[in-house]
């Protein structure tokens, strides 16, 4: 399946993700080297923690122009969890922070969205297994994955105003965008590497792009 880069910028469980890539027949390389990112066939952008901190760390590596160039060249890239959130234009987590802007939309507090609603009692972070409802079943990452399949989430913020890239969502008081895409850019709010056979199937489909 050729080589998949996992971007190392000091954020995320990189080796768990690498193990999952290997499990579906891929060849992972964990790297922060621009030359490697330019040479591989596709890129995974992981991430955990706060948006602003992750965005600052990614920019400090000097990799953003490299990643932008690879996206513009048509190379498939997928953000995972916070890595997906970084694909959008901005986040309001602990102040306003600019994202990479490859997808339209912004990232907002899930707790704020639930406040004053009948679902205010739902726990935040949204942590655990939840089902997928399809907004666009033609997305190649959903091939062979039945609607209603469960995947694993851990997050306190979520994407909004992203209807043009929404492919699947999960119910949690609001419609939580779970899988987004635009051209060669993809994002999973859930962790495919923690989502059992369904997550591995989605990861395998990305590796076949």
Please give the residue ranges for each predicted region.
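Short acidic low-complexity segments
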Residues: 28-39
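Divalent-cation-assisted or electrostatically stabilized phosphate/pyrophosphate-binding catalytic cores
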Residues: 17
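Structural motif
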Residues: 44-46
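Extreme N-terminal starter segment of soluble prokaryotic enzymes
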Residues: 1-5
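Amide-donor transfer/coupling interface in amidating biosynthetic enzymes
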Residues: 72, 106-209
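Structural signature of beta-strand start/N-cap positions in the alpha/beta core
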Residues: 27, 42, 76-78, 150
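Alpha-helix C-terminal capping/helix-to-coil transition sites in glycosyltransferase folds
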Residues: 39-40, 73
